[in-house]
Every structure is written in C-alpha cells, then in structure tokens.
Design a protein with these regions (language model features):
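Catalytic cores and adjacent flexible loops of soluble metabolic enzymes
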Residues: 1-229
Length: 229
C-alpha cells in the first residue's frame, strides 16, 4: 500500500498505465520530461477521468544530468495556469540552484535523487545527493521558500524600529522665535521625529513660534503662517 503513485517521464505517453494507476484513487504525480503540451494534456485528462485522488505535475528535464540552461523553469507557472494543478520540479541538475529557483517560481514540491554513496556509481550518481547533502539541500530550499512570504507593504515587525532612522525636518542651526523657516535653518536629516521631508517647501516661509536648538525636530506646533510673528 503506497500513499501516492509516481509516473516517470518515460511513461507519460503510456495512457493505459496512467488510467490504471489513477483508478486506484490515490494521489498521482506525473513527471513531464521530454513531453509536449499535447502529451501532458493527454496524461492529465487520462488521470482525471480515471479517478486520480489528486494530481500534481513535475517540470522535468530528462537529461542526466540536466544542464541549467535547458531546464526552462519559467514553464512552472505556465503549467500551473494551463492545467490548474500543483506543479513541482523533478530535479536532475547538480546542486540546489535549480530547486531554489523553482520554488521561487511557485513549485510546491521537489523530487531529488538520493544515493547512499556517490562513489558506488550508477546512471544517476552524478546528480544524486548523499544523505548529509540532502539535509543541506532541504534546508536551503526551505529557506528560499520562507523568503517568499506574502504580498504586503509597510514595515515588518523587525522594521518598525528602523522607521526611527528615517529622515525628518530638523533645525540645522539655532532658530529664534519669530525667525522665518528657510532652507538654511531647516533641512531633512536623520533621525525621524519631525515633519516629513516632503513638507520642506510648505514650511519654508513660515515663522517659528518658539526657539529651536540645532537638531530639534520641526513639528506643526512650532510654526505660524508667514506674517504671524
């Protein structure tokens, strides 16, 4: 009894096999190495119509090992849009770069070959990972996934403290009550705490209604309109 059934790239054109596997009602994963759009579409239709419990596709390059320039990972979001199923990567490349890029493009699962000892040889030894390498690979890919987050703007929790390091309008020399605010006595400097820098044209020509020391933040209560001294 297995939790899911994997159809390798070389079997994607065997529609009777796919239909039989799908009829077992288990989740299915189909690799798409070498396959045309029509061949992938036929495989998806066969799996769905035969009762696959759930279906995912894997973008795959069946070159052993796969060259980075031939992996065409931009196909991943295209496949998601075309067949409306989860898409991952069957990774036959060397190293973690392709898998990390795939995750950044929306891949939801990654298949990687494992060998207990690469020196033992075999047809997939060149791009297989040993156990300690697999652990590092998983950590690397998960770290990339964690950086994706969600679509949001504004300061994050850790950025809130950094807001204080923004610029604001401050006195850059002593200002006496009644002085006009000018570009010479007020400028945009760090830290925050004063009026926003984009208000500099608005405040220039206004009158200080109290004395300000060099470095003091400029706020609305410090100002009167021009002519009110």
């Amino acid at each position: 009894d297995v939790p899911a059934i994997k159809i390798a790239s070389f079997e994607i054109i065997d529609l009777p096999l796919i239909s039989y596997a799908a009829a077992q009602g288990r989740p299915m994963i189909i690799s798409t190495g070498m396959a045309t759009v029509a061949e992938i579409d036929n495989a998806v239709r066969a799996a769905v119509s035969s009762g696959a419990g759930a279906l995912a596709l894997l973008r795959c390059n069946s070159g052993y090992p796969a060259e980075p320039g031939e992996m065409d990972l931009h196909s991943i979001p295209a496949m998601q849009a075309m067949w409306n199923v989860p898409v991952g990567l069957s990774d036959h490349s060397v190293g973690p770069s392709a898998a990390s890029a795939a995750v950044a493009l929306g891949a939801v699962l990654v298949e990687k070959h494992l060998t207990l000892r690469r020196a033992n040889g075999g047809p997939d030894a060149a791009f297989s990972l040993e156990p300690d390498e697999l652990s590092e690979f998983v950590s690397s890919v998960r770290e990339v996934h964690s950086t994706l987050g969600s679509v949001r703007f504004g300061p994050s929790k850790r950025e809130v403290a950094s807001v204080a390091l923004r610029r604001s309008l401050r006195a850059v020399k002593p200002i006496t009550q009644g002085d006009l605010i000018t570009m010479e006595n007020v400028r945009s400097v760090r830290p925050a705490g004063g009026l926003a820098p984009d208000l500099i044209d608005t405040v220039c020509g206004m009158v200080a209604c109290r004395a300000l020391d060099q470095g003091d933040p400029l706020v609305w209560s410090d100002l009167n309109p021009a002519g009110m001294r």
